[in-house]
Regions:
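Chalcogenol-based redox active-site neighborhoods
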Residues: 1-149
């Protein structure tokens, strides 16, 4: 599936870190930054979410909710969130179907990617890292949100 800026993104329902279903179309109120990432507890992913956590207020001022998506189960997400004081919802894409729909499924699992989605489920911006050890930092993402919102 090819995602295009200005077009609708695929809706999905996944299990959240609290063990409950999370359906994008039912939860989206303002803007959402979908963050696909390889896995909880890995060095780059931990640094990425710590960076988001440390800049949480900047994202809130822009009415952006951050949602993380990896293949880890909800119990692992809970542990990761607690250990690193991560305030964002983390979703489980165990089989990689949603990652595949968003072109973030690679040979070795979920690839790192970000997708800015507005409250009408329209894609405003997307970026998939070619190598998962790279990531956009919060300042870069905040500038992109301002530019594309």
């Amino acid at each position: 599936m090819s995602l295009k800026v200005g077009k609708a993104v695929p809706d999905f329902s996944l299990v959240a870190d609290n063990g409950k279903p999370y359906k994008l179309s039912n939860k989206i109120k303002n803007k959402v930054l979908l963050v696909f990432y390889p896995g909880d507890g890995t060095p780059v992913c931990t640094n990425q979410f710590a960076d988001f956590r440390n800049n949480e207020e900047k994202f809130k001022k822009l009415d952006v909710e951050i949602i993380g998506i990896s293949s880890n189960d909800s119990k692992y997400h809970q542990s990761f969130k607690k250990e690193h004081n991560i305030p964002f919802t983390l979703l489980t894409d165990e089989k990689g179907q949603v990652a595949s729909d968003y072109n973030c499924l690679g040979m070795f699992g979920i690839k790192r990617g970000i997708f800015l989605v507005d409250n009408k489920m329209q894609l405003k911006y997307s970026h998939i890292e070619s190598v998962s050890i790279f990531r956009r930092n919060s300042d870069e993402i905040i500038d992109l949100i301002k530019k594309y919102s």
